Swiss-Prot record:
PROSITE patterns cross-referenced by the UniProt entry: HOMEOBOX_1, HOMEOBOX_2
Function: Transcription factor that binds to the promoter of target genes. Regulates fate specification and/or differentiation of multiple cell types arising from the embryonic mesodermal (M) lineage and the ABp(l/r)paa precursors. In the postembryonic M lineage, regulates cleavage orientation, cell proliferation and cell fate specification. Regulates hlh-1 expression to specify coelomocyte fate in the mesodermal (M) lineage. In AWC neurons, initiates expression of ceh-36, leading to the expression of terminal differentiation genes.
Region described as Disordered: 1-78, 139-209
Subcellular location per the Swiss-Prot or TrEMBL entry: Nucleus
Organism from which the protein derives: Caenorhabditis elegans
UniProt-recorded Gene Ontology molecular function terms: DNA-binding transcription factor activity, RNA polymerase II-specific; RNA polymerase II transcription regulatory region sequence-specific DNA binding
Stored InterPro entries: HD, HD_metazoa, HMX_Homeobox_TF, Homeobox_CS, Homeodomain-like_sf
GO cellular component terms attached to this protein's record: nucleus
Record carries keyword Cell cycle: no
Principal location listed in the UniProt entry: nucleus
Domain of life, source organism: Eukaryota
Positions of transmembrane segments: none
Record protein name field: Homeobox protein mls-2
GO biological process annotation, one example: regulation of mesodermal cell fate specification
Length: 341
């Protein structure tokens, strides 16, 4: 080969001109031959190995499909999955449009394979707002528990109110005194009942007219406790039921007890003020505000009015109207006595 010859050192000085020309003419050919050899060393496009991952996987599965018939169904589903999720993404595409296209692809895949949801990794695709709100409520179970407990408490409170009202409406043959003692016990017994319908019952409040209230007040002033016969007669007279009369008397007795307790505190306060700001009888003067009226016959009205609270009322009046005027009157009296002496 000429390449072996060219590898030897060439001495151009010993050559003739003709030989030089021949050697010079051979040099470009050698370069061309080297370029051809380099091209032969490079792999041509025809000799490149062409392969696809899906084809390789199919070639690997071919012997298994021939051996087992059950694997054919699995291969078919795998092929569907491989072809279904092919998504051609264009880098120049708008991100919003790409997301919409991806969502549409997932929806199509879910419809083809009869899937409940398109993809478990994207649970927000294709879900209505009602389900999202349901998931939101499920994420906060404490709120639901608290609301349920609040409703149960309201129902229990309403049930207790209704039961106390029902307990007050017992048999009309019993006396009112026994009914007052059995109010708490009857409500406790009925609170243990397991019927939820009784707890939800609501009693309508009875509205009494003025004439009915006045008659009931007059009867209450005469008698605090009524027998069954008296209660039935009064109910027939006022066009009310015996239960309504009985409940009214119970409420009125409770109100009277509360008023008595408040009156006791007021009386004790008045007595305390009377003891602190009391004036001796020898130095006490008659005030025009506190003068006791007399009749035409000269009879003092104090003797006609029997009230054990005269001293306390006088002391309270002194406290309310102030001690400035009383002190001034005492000073005048002292100066008058000094002049008389």
């Amino acid at each position: 080969m000429p390449t072996s010859v060219m590898n030897l050192p060439i001495d151009m000085t010993t050559m003739s001109s003709q030989e030089r020309l021949e050697k010079m003419s051979q040099l470009p050919k050698i370069e061309l031959m080297e370029e051809e050899e380099e091209e032969e060393m490079k792999p041509s496009s025809d000799n490149k190995i062409k392969f696809n991952i899906s084809e390789l996987l199919e070639d690997d599965r071919k012997p298994t499909t021939q051996s087992s018939p059950s694997a054919s169904s699995e291969d078919s589903t795998n092929e569907i999955e491989q072809t279904a999720f092919n998504f051609n993404f264009d880098p120049k595409m708008n991100p919003i449009s790409a997301l919409l296209q991806l969502q549409q692809t997932f929806l199509n895949v879910g419809n083809q394979q009869n899937m409940i949801s398109p993809l478990t990794m994207f649970p927000f695709f294709g879900l209505p707002t009602a389900q999202l709100m349901h998931f939101k409520n499920m994420s906060n179970p404490d709120v639901n528990i608290q609301s349920d407990n609040g409703e149960e408490k309201d129902e229990k409170s309403e049930g207790k109110d209704g039961e106390t009202r029902d307990s007050t409406g017992g048999s009309p043959l019993e006396s009112d005194a026994e009914d007052d003692d059995d109010i708490g016990r009857g409500s406790d017994d009925e609170a243990n009942s397991s019927d939820p319908s009784q707890n939800r019952k609501k009693k309508t409040r009875t509205v009494f007219s003025r004439s009915q209230v006045s008659q009931l007040e007059m009867m209450f002033e005469c008698k605090r406790y009524l027998s069954s016969q008296e209660r039935s007669n009064l109910a027939q007279k006022l066009h009310l039921t015996e239960t309504q009369v009985k409940i009214w008397f119970q409420n009125r007795r409770n109100k009277f007890k509360r008023q008595a307790q408040t009156d006791d505190t007021n009386i004790s306060l008045q007595m305390h003020r009377a003891n602190v700001f009391s004036i001796p009888a020898t130095t006490a003067l008659t005030s025009p505000i506190l003068t006791i009226p007399t009749t035409s016959a000269g009879v003092n009205m104090r003797n006609m009015i029997s009230s054990p609270m005269d001293a306390s009322a006088t002391a309270a009046a002194r406290f309310l109207f102030g001690f400035g005027t009383l002190q001034a009157q005492q000073n005048l009296n002292a100066s008058a006595q000094a002049q008389n002496m």
